[in-house]
């Protein structure tokens, strides 16, 4: 049971496949009198072929001038510590199994804003052919004019990359406060990116399994 919680990792885009994997592992490690081991932290739903590496995205955003606070990236360490505790729990009784679940949920909540950043970056690869760019000025070449005017996403991306915007917090919330065309364009872009990420089940190994990476 301890090897199961520490060393077995898996991901599949089909939720039923993930549940069947859990069932097979539970049957293989069944112990009379003990609850089923908590496995949600290591067996997850997602598309393993479509995800991003956190350091790559972090570097790409910094090149474009985005504000990235180190405190936001400290979330990775906190989540890893919580998940390390989950792996150390034996789930020998209901109380330990519940604690495993609570710690895993706390880790997921910590990682959610970073997950949103990776989802956004991956979605831009789909929405803007040629993304990423190494200079914001190159974006205009990737986005065609609309009715003779610059594409509204140019304003939206510029607004998100503004050094006065905490990008991780904004993407985590999914909404940029304020009014105006640039803010509206940014919110429309984030909405489309989030919908695409949900629909395609993007899976980022770096944030899904922080104890490994």
Where do the language-model regions lie?
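SAM-dependent methyltransferase catalytic region
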Residues: 1-213
């Amino acid at each position: 049971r301890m090897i199961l919680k520490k060393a077995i990792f898996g991901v599949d885009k089909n939720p039923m496949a993930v549940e069947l994997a859990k069932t097979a592992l539970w049957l293989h490690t069944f112990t009379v009198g003990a609850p089923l081991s908590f496995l949600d932290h290591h067996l997850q739903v997602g598309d393993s072929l479509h995800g991003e590496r956190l350091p790559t995205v972090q570097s790409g955003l910094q090149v474009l001038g985005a504000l990235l606070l180190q405190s936001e990236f400290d979330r990775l360490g906190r989540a890893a510590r919580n998940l390390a505790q989950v792996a150390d729990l034996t789930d020998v009784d209901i109380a330990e199994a519940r604690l495993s679940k609570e710690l895993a949920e706390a880790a997921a909540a910590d990682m959610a804003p970073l997950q949103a950043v990776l989802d956004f970056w991956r979605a831009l690869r789909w929405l803007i052919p040629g993304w990423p760019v190494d200079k914001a000025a190159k974006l205009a070449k990737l986005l065609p004019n609309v009715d003779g005017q610059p594409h509204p996403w140019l304003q939206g991306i510029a607004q998100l990359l503004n050094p006065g915007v905490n990008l991780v917090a904004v993407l985590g919330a999914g909404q940029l406060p304020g009014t105006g065309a640039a803010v509206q364009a940014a919110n429309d872009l984030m909405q489309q990116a989030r919908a695409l990420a949900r629909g395609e089940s993007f899976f980022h190994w770096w944030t899904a399994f922080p104890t490994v990476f």
